[in-house]
Amino acid sequence: MTSTPSKSRKSAKAAKAAKAEAAAFAKSRALSKTPPPFRNRVVDKKVLKELVAWAFKNHGTAATASMADQLKDLGFKYATQAAVSISVNDLKVPAAKKDLLDQAEELITETEESYRLGVITEVERHTKVIDTWTETNERLVDAVKKNFNDNDPLNSVWMMANSGARGNMSQVRQLVGMRGLMANPQGEIIDLPIRTNFREGLTVTEYVISSYGARKGLVDTALRTADSGYLTRRLVDVAQDVIVREDDCGTMRSIMVKAEDGRFGNRLVGRLTADQVLGADGEVIAERNSEIDPPLSKRFEAAGVSALMVRSPLTCEANRSVCRKCYGWALAHNQLVDLGEAVGIIAAQSIGEPGTQLTMRTFHTGGVSTAESGVVRSKFEGTVEFGSKAKVRPYRTPHGVNAQQSDVDFSLTIKPSGSGKPQKIEITNGSLLFVDDGQKIASDVTVATIAAGAVQKSVEKATKDVICDLAGQVSYDPTIQPREVTDRQGNITHKAQRLGRMWVLAGDVYNLPPNARPVVSSGGSVIESQVLAEASQASEYGGAIRLREALGDSREVQIVTTSMTLRDFKLLGESTHAGEIWNLEAKDGTRYRLNTIPGSKIGNAEVIAELADDRFRTQTGGLVKFAPGLAIKKARSAKNGYEVNKGGTLLWIPQETHEINKDISLLMITDGQWIEAGTEVVKDIFSQTAGIVSVTQKNDILREIIVRSGSFHLCTEKKALERFQGDGVMVNPGEAIAKGISSDAMVFVQAVETPEGTGLLLRPVEEYTIPNEAQLPDLGHVKQPNGPHLGIKATQRLAFKDNELVKSVEGVELLRTQLMLETFDTTPQMTVDVEAVPDKRAKTIERLQLVILESILVRRDTISDSSHGSTHTELQVEDGQSIKAGDVVATTQILCKQAGVAEMPEATEDEPVRRLIVERPEDTITINTSGAPVVTVGQRVVDGEELAQGQPSDCCGEVEQVSANSVTMRLGRPYMISPDSLLHVRDGDLVQRGDGLALLVFERQKTGDIVQGLPRIEELLEARRPRESSILCKKPGTVEIKQGEDDEFTTVTVIESDDAIAEYPILLGRNVMVSDGQQVNAGELLTDGPINPHELLECFFEDLRSRKPLMDAAQEAIAKLQHRLVTEVQNVYKSQGVSIHDKHIEVIVRQMTSKVRIEDAGDTTLLPGELIELRQVENTNQAMSITGGAPAEFTPVLLGITKASLNTDSFISAASFQETTRVLTEAAIEGKSDWLRGLKENVIIGRLIPAGTGFSGFEEELRAEAGPHPDILSEDPAGYRRMQNLRPDYTVDMPAAPAAKSTALLDDPSAADLEATRSRHGIEAEASNFAAFTRPDADNELAEEQVLDPAAVENLQEQGLLSDE
């Protein structure tokens, strides 16, 4: 019952609150007298953001919401009045566009020209073109901006893009500038940009080029939403149980945050300092555990603090949660986070939500970025001086410009030609110089590009083909110096050693057919239509010619080399429903079934026909036995049966076998029963013979039913039964079998069990006589002195071998007599044609003819393809003509198309002449010179080089003749070849237009596999092992680099601190990222490539392990990796312009790195290979050190978010995520308990979640009052009342009736009240505080179980408060 003092206390409180409210109101009135700050400037998106943030910080939520509302109204009002909309006329194309494009065109024409003259390579041309267009595009954007700013600053499009309301510059550029370069489906950039914009409209070609990218964008967006949603789900699952559960974990560990360019930006805001922070002069700026707000962050910057230690979720030591001090501010209200805040879920959502904004990937940029290096120009005319410190080496830029690269830092001076101060330029290592020492230069000349620090970019090797543009003869410049390179497989390739030109000198190149031989001599003159080369096709064996109809562009000539007609046999064909059947009939009437049909081809040892013979056909299946003397040839496969070696007698014991696959319930007879023919043994299956049945079954499924015919005799004679046990024995006629049992014929005796008793079954034996050789008429064969032979032989084949059991109901054929083809030539392509021919005497009778044909395909004259010259083919034979072996069947001539001089390369043994060249009059040019020529014979000249004083050449080629006032040149085309390129052609080779000349090998910046956006985030958070990861240094030391022979591989040796030597072999195609003599640390990259995070953690741990205790080494290694992961994830988001606070990523990374793997359990109860929390192992090992046991050894592990989710302590959470069955079965087998600590488990079970208002931080006070469980409320009409627990975790809520007397809600009931309630329920006083189930206490000790009073339970059940259970 409440008493009066508590009433008075309440009224005093109310008065106090009213006073405070009045004071606050007065203060706000006073504040409003100071004039609001007045700002006069353009407000764009950025300023709006700052304005709303300022309002939120200083005036709270309600005021900000109201202000935002007013801003919106203001915006709409003026947008309406100003009529901001987009019309076609707002899209204004800058006038400067035409000039910019013309300049670009001019540059590109120059580039193409230098490529044509062989000054730059194909790769350099491509790079230059792409860079030119990229630069033009950038200059055009500037022109667009300038145009809008100067001429129409209030243009709707410009205002939208500029203020950040909608759209960005790249979109405006496409509307009014140019669309620019597009990528093709392979991701390479097409070097033809789209010059028009959307205002001018695209041509069909441009539209098609851009449609690829547009479709890709749409598909990416669709995929992205799904991917991003799944990422969020995994993140939520891994972090859902991270809840702020304590105020301060008291850890002394922390992370360091460094200033970037002297500024911290937002990176410190909302964190707590881990140590005192001192300024440069030693004054204390902040104590430990100070909250850092923006003003304090600015003070740090002002005081010159470059790095400081802050508390972070990564180092928090709170058990299975994060404490308030380590987490810092909740970013929703910029105050220290509350207890019970579900920070894990907030972190997951913060990282997952921007996923949709991340691109899936962008494409290759192809061009080489020129942004990192600053271009320096000369300010006046003067002379260049390098100075004594300079060290330079020749270098060719990616655009093909010959420059010099500096190897050291030095100063370059330009001394003016007149008076004045010299210009000094600081040159850094790696910079490019475009001038020479002592060179005189004009003003505004590019002197150098300064490299921005020693940046080692990762590059990859790429290749590009050089394709020949004209037919002719290849000639190298001597500078190329080709060398032979043999690779590991023994293939020989030719490589260029130096930069140089490869020339192709013009001419008409003819390809010769494989067997053609030239009929003109090298250097001889040829006239039009003269035969240059001739090829002939000859017969190999000779024979009768058959000309076939022409097919397409070729004609088949068949030569019958051998033929054989079976004269003793008639060929008879009959039609059946299954198709045509052909038989051979001999004079004595025996018939053979033909296995092939006329018109088909057969090979050696194939069966032509088979004797139709029923003498060896049985009635049923049975057992085969060979009598002594019968022999067969061993065969590899029994498919065609076994050939008889020697004739003899074959014994056959018939038995009928039914192979069945049916249920045993369908069986209609019993095992061992005697049945008559026609008995139904299984439903719908009848026996053909009488005999004894045996049944084979397996798992109540019938397999076989065997019926053995014969005569059955009951027998009790033990000796006889033993003799005939098992497989049975063959007994000759008249031989005694048992007492009173004998047989006149040969029988096969077996002992059998029947329902009547044991007895002997005498089975009949059939005898078949097998002749030694097949009795056949003469078949004959044809032999030729030099052609292939042909013959037919008869063979007998037995279908089964000795003791083989034939399972069958129908009869089988035991012996087959077959006619086989025998060609004594065993070449696989030798086939025989089977033909039906009429008999020479009786035309109605058909005979079988076997023919061996030689087939020659003769090309008909087609409208000749130009490379073959004009070909002319003639047949030299007629149909039916007989020719001898080696006679020519057809000849092909290659005719000259235009008069000229024929040349051909030298024929070698391994390579005959396959091409020849005719140098035509138009391939040379004679130029008259005004003065004496300055060139010599054999010299190669390109456009613009002087032939005579003041007379430049207007074509490229090789000088062939020089006279007093003229020069004759053979036209040609130079191709620049870069060093290390693969040469496909040799000096002097002849090439056709479109042939590959060389493969240029060049290095380009790696762009293809920068996995951007989502896939990269996923790769990091799932801790994926990359396919080709970089090689990491295991221990710190000094690097030594050794080159392997032939540049095949490099070895990087690291001499470690204890003088141990670690060797890292590096394969071809990998770029070494360290230099000789460099100091490296553990985990540093030795080669380029993606890093394997697992390997990195291992490197850190192994290195620290040798110097520090196990626990410290693990913590430090994990800390290094955590820092790396957070930075990497942040980099991806920053590159896409998304800002996420570090602490969210830290919460996730903390979950990924919280586990260690036990290697050796020591004396602990842990198991080797178990994944367990680091803190748990730490506690276990501390306990071991007290008791003196051996501690557990472990290694830290990194788990991807999916793995971490499946490895949580809660099996309910893991099962609801993935692999439900596996997780639940394992949990059941291991007998796991789930302590329901996280949110997900509780949601699934349907309890209050332990976050926010359900957070159990106030548990202790409740426990003190009411024991360990939430309370059950009585249904007392006076209101809600506490009652001691009946069952844990169940709350019975009953609505209260309007209060009759003013009892304070949830105050403790008085003794009298309790007594009344008890008496109403009939509960005895002692029984009221029983606990039906007790929950394990906080320290996991079970409270003792108390016994229920049966009477009380019964009473409660009657009232329906306890169920029967």
From Swiss-Prot:
Binds 1 Zn(2+) ion per subunit. One of its GO terms (cellular component) is DNA-directed RNA polymerase complex. InterPro entries: DNA-dir_RpoC2_beta_pp, DNA-dir_RpoC_beta_prime, RNA_pol_Rpb1_3, RNA_pol_Rpb1_3_sf, RNA_pol_Rpb1_4, RNA_pol_Rpb1_5, Rpb1_funnel_sf. Its EC number is 2.7.7.6. Its cofactor is Zn(2+). It comes from the Bacteria. Keywords: DNA-directed RNA polymerase, Metal-binding, Nucleotidyltransferase, Transcription, Transferase, Zinc. GO terms for molecular function: DNA binding; DNA-directed RNA polymerase activity; zinc ion binding. Gene3D superfamilies: 1.10.132.30, 1.10.150.390, 1.10.1790.20, 2.40.50.100, RNA polymerase Rpb1, domain 3 (1.10.274.100). CDD domains: RNAP_beta'_C. It catalyses: RNA(n) + a ribonucleoside 5'-triphosphate = RNA(n+1) + diphosphate. Zn(2+) binds at C249, C316, C323, C326. SUPFAM superfamilies: beta and beta-prime subunits of DNA dependent RNA-polymerase. GO terms for biological process: DNA-templated transcription. Belongs to the RNA polymerase beta' chain family. RpoC2 subfamily. In cyanobacteria the RNAP catalytic core is composed of 2 alpha, 1 beta, 1 beta', 1 gamma and 1 omega subunit. When a sigma factor is associated with the core the holoenzyme is formed, which can initiate transcription. DNA-dependent RNA polymerase catalyzes the transcription of DNA into RNA using the four ribonucleoside triphosphates as substrates. This is DNA-directed RNA polymerase subunit beta'. It comes from Synechococcus sp. (strain CC9311). The gene is rpoC2.
